[in-house]
Swiss-Prot record:
Signal peptide: none
Keyword Glycosyltransferase belongs to the record: yes
Pathway assigned in UniProt: Protein modification; protein glycosylation
Domain of life, source organism: Bacteria
Gene Ontology molecular functions: dolichyl-phosphate-mannose-protein mannosyltransferase activity
A Pfam family matched in the record: PMT_4TMC
Segments passing through the bilayer: 38-58, 119-139, 145-165, 168-188, 237-257, 274-294, 388-408, 418-438, 441-461, 485-505
Main location: membrane
Protein name per the record: Polyprenol-phosphate-mannose--protein mannosyltransferase
Upper lineage: Bacteria, Bacillati, Actinomycetota, Actinomycetes, Mycobacteriales
This protein's record includes keyword Cell membrane: yes
Gene assigned in the entry: pmt
Bilayer topology term: Multi-pass membrane protein
């Protein structure tokens, strides 16, 4: 009889606050089945992300904010300084560039190779969309130790409409999502490595003798976490939220390990040995990488606000007059961007037909129309249309709240640590937007939520697998529920795929897919 799969080394942990000794960290041995699993997902990822990439819209017409980012990336190609520095956004005709440059620098690589073409401005998002699936699977494998859970996470990531559409258009969000997901993976690797070091020390000495516990030494995985967080920040300022949430989580996990392994003064030990190195890796490193992403702006004499001090843009009584020319201009640029974001509120008259608020994101309640072509002649009679929506597969998004509640219950009631990082990452992408509720927002802000919803769903499926009585199919009721759910996700993905890919469909098919008025 098959058994339920635990969240490996993260399951029922009755001693989490009792100081009992934890089990040894899990070992992750790569098997032939892992190779087959990842290869299958890789093939489908490439097919779903790259098929028709250059013709996703009529003649490759830019959609939504592609109209901003595509020419900005092309500016970088045209103003290329050298291979290391790259180029700048010259700001012709579209006002202030309000996002950091990294994502557009990456898109510029595609345009440099393939020219100012749809393939050129979409190839890099497709690559990073594929890598995001692998990052999701890597986290699921690390938390579960299960090839099956990894495979489930891969299927769910393949079948989500938000991840798919975000991987096929030259927007910024898929770059942010990849770097955040990769940072979460590195954070988990760091925690598991520290667990292993303490376990080895315990086996060697029989106890952790120091009052404050040991120093962990240089932590390359924590450093890697900081690198990915810095890259996320260099795509969008919302990366700041993840720096704060992941930084606190890293310190909390260190404190927990010290307490769990019997360190007497574990709080002081954490403050003494862990906090300063964590600040270095998770705050200083991201800040340095963020500044590095602006290297072309500093290198060019024609960058926007590059000479704001001497041309009078910065007033004589400003404190920025105390700074060197380039630093003053750079700070003034950031102040201007901050003022823009602060003024982009619903109450100040900035409304948009596809505006949405965070509570609606939890159920994909207000998607975004990216492309529309109607009144197309149909062979079946009547008229047809092509529509592309940024839209979440309902069978995934409608379980967002239930799986979060399950994860919270698993952590607080069953002491299951496997859900900690996914929960923290989801909170970092959701809670800060509640504080800015009046701001103009769009559903693509929620793109960073779905990887962690998928991971929690995959972990929950792993725990359900093997539970219950055996059925005539040879599977338990729990296993049948998992198979049924995965089948439902795939069927929904196929049913809504015309809205993801922009297939020509009769009007009545389109109407049958518009289940709610808010989807229109």
């Amino acid at each position: 009889m098959s058994q339920a799969l635990p969240v490996r080394d993260q399951g029922r942990d009755q001693g989490i606050f009792a100081g009992t000794l934890p089990p040894a960290p899990p070992k992750f041995k790569w098997t032939r089945l892992d190779t087959y699993t990842w290869a299958i997902i890789a093939v489908f990822a490439l097919v779903t992300r790259f098929t028709g990439l250059s013709s996703a819209t009529a003649s490759g017409t830019p959609v939504f904010d592609e109209k901003h980012y595509v020419p900005q990336a092309w500016d970088m190609v045209r103003s290329w300084i050298n291979p290391i520095t790259g180029g700048i956004e010259s700001n012709p005709g579209y006002g202030l560039v309000v996002h950091p440059p990294l994502a557009k620098q990456l898109e510029a690589l595609g345009e440099w190779v393939f020219g100012y073409t749809p393939l050129g401005w979409r190839i890099m998002v497709a690559i990073f969309g594929t890598l995001t699936i692998f990052a999701i699977m890597a986290i699921a494998r690390r938390l579960s130790g299960s090839t099956m859970v990894t495979f489930i996470a891969g299927i769910l990531a393949l079948a989500d409409g938000v991840l798919l559409v975000s991987s096929r258009f030259g927007m910024l969000d898929i770059f942010l999502v990849f770097f955040i997901t990769a940072a979460a993976w590195a954070l988990i690797r760091d925690h598991q490595q520290m667990h292993q070091r303490l376990n080895d020390l315990l086996l060697t000495n029989g106890q952790i003798t120091k009052d404050f516990g040991p120093r962990f030494g240089f932590r390359w995985w924590r450093f890697t976490t900081g690198v990915f967080l810095g890259l996320a920040l260099s795509v969008k300022w919302s990366g700041l939220y993840y720096i704060a949430f992941f930084g606190l989580t890293s310190v909390f996990l260190d404190l927990w390990l010290r307490k769990r392994y019997g360190v007497r003064r574990y709080v002081t030990g954490t403050l003494k040995n862990d906090v300063i190195p964590a600040l270095g890796s998770l705050v200083i490193i991201p800040a340095l990488l963020y500044i590095w992403s602006w290297r072309a702006w500093f290198a060019s004499e024609t960058s926007v606000y590059r000479h704001a001090k001497t041309d009078g843009t910065i007033t004589e009584d400003s404190i920025l007059q105390l700074f060197p020319e380039s630093i003053a201009g750079w700070i003034h640029y950031h102040i201007s961007v901050l003022e823009f974001h602060g003024s982009l509120t619903t109450s100040s008259g900035h409304s948009h037909p596809w505006d949405s608020k965070p509570w609606a994101w939890l159920v994909s309640g207000r998607p975004i129309l990216y492309f529309s072509s109607t009144d197309i002649s149909c062979d079946v009679g009547g008229t047809c249309r092509r529509m592309i929506y940024l839209f979440g597969t309902p069978a995934i998004w409608w379980l967002t709240v239930p799986v979060i509640l399950w994860a919270l219950w698993s952590f607080f009631a069953r002491r299951s640590r496997g859900y900690v990082v996914p929960l923290v990452a989801f909170a970092a992408g959701f809670l800060p937007w509640l504080a800015a509720y009046d701001r103009q927002m769009y559903f693509f802000y929620a793109t960073a939520l779905v990887p962690f919803t998928i991971i929690m769903l995959a972990l929950a499926c792993g725990e359900l697998w093997g539970r219950g009585k055996m059925t005539p199919t040879g599977l338990t009721r729990g296993s049948m529920a998992v198979v049924t759910y995965i089948s439902l996700v795939v069927m929904m993905f196929l049913a809504f795929s015309p809205l993801f890919y922009g297939f020509v469909i009769p009007d009545y098919v389109y109407e049958s897919l518009m289940w709610f008025p808010s989807w229109r």
